[in-house]
Amino acid sequence: MCGIIGFTGNLQAPGILVDGLQQLEYRGYDSAGIAVNNGSETKIVKTTGKVATLREKVEATADLAGTCGIGHTRWATHGGVTEVNAHPHVSGNVTLIHNGIIENYKELAASLKTKGFTAISETDTEVAAMLIDSLYDGDPFAALKEADKALEGAYGFCVMFKDH
């Protein structure tokens, strides 16, 4: 089962997110990642394997700073165990992590492709990020409500919008 953590505050997010993911290791996982927003851009670090490997990559990533972020440990349900399939996933203004299964993700991916969205992963999570991004007009809550109407399955999201 996946582990999800989010943080916003006055402290730097990267260490807090990785520490939180370490606390969720007992849940089992095959990959891990974090996204951190510094107010102007979102940076992502992800890896297959253990949170300890993620921590090493985070510590080696220059300019990874920000007080808002999300983190995820993944247990693969769609797509193989690869860094590309690890969460978080980004589409435009939307950075998303997810637990659950989106049953109609293939149909949504096909529809989104006609609108110019192309997935690079094999995950239902990236399709959800693309869907939310396609519906986003500056109001995060409206985009999420509309996306929820289109999504079929059981799921939970943690989402960051680049401009909020």
Where are these regions (language model features)?
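Conserved short alpha-helical segments that host acidic/polar catalytic motifs at enzyme active sites
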Residues: 1-164
